[in-house]
């Protein structure tokens, strides 16, 4: 008889585990996102009566929500604060939608987040200083929104960042020196803001940088000689700024150059070791590239 009852208990435990699903807290957070972004009008809607693992764009591993990919899905409205309850999230891709409102500070509580893609939305307000708490982040892309204020110094704390794209917003102020600590960075996009001042010499620490786009801002002064250390650079766009000297660019290692766009300033830049057969150089006021 004891064996019989033991088998019943074991069977019950196995059944509970098999049908446990995601936690109530995570499911509630997902429903909050659905409701706050007008889920009934999404292109691909969620059937809230079905298991979470079956919801479009949601990846569940071991009963934990680890990815949300709702790219180009007609999300409208703001991001809810309880999105922080998705504590196992590693990827959040809500790009190419019509999300409004501000970036909730609670986003910074997603300590496992590796990818945050919110580009091509209508998000306004400042980038919260708490963004620097996302220490696992490898990609932060918020280009083409209505973000204002300055670039937070705390971004320099996100040491694993490889892609940082803040282009086409209303950001102002200077590039914080702290960005020089992002030594794993491969892409930095600050195009089309109202950023000003000189490029900090600390940028020369970004030895893995392949793409640096600073065009269409109000940067001034001379290009710092420290940029000569960026031997991996392939794309460098600095046109439509107010630089008064490009002399230090002649120190730039250019063996990997594919694209270089600048304002001519009545002066030809003599690069060393440049391969003119593979490099596009344009002394133009503006030339966009399709990647």
Briefly describe each language-model feature range:
Residues 1-24:
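Bacterial Sec-dependent N-terminal signal peptides
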Residues 35-78, 291:
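LRR flanking "cap" motifs
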Residues 62, 84-89, 108-113, 132-137, ...:
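Leucine-rich repeat
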Residues 73, 97, 118-121, 142-145, ...:
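Consensus "Asn ladder" position of solenoid repeat domains
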Residues 79-81, 103-105, 124-129, 148-153, ...:
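The feature encodes a structural signal of leucine-rich repeats
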Residues 86-168:
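A generic tandem-repeat structural signature
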Residues 135-225:
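Eukaryotic tandem repeat interaction scaffolds
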Residues 206, 210-221, 226-290:
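Leucine-rich repeat domain C-terminal region
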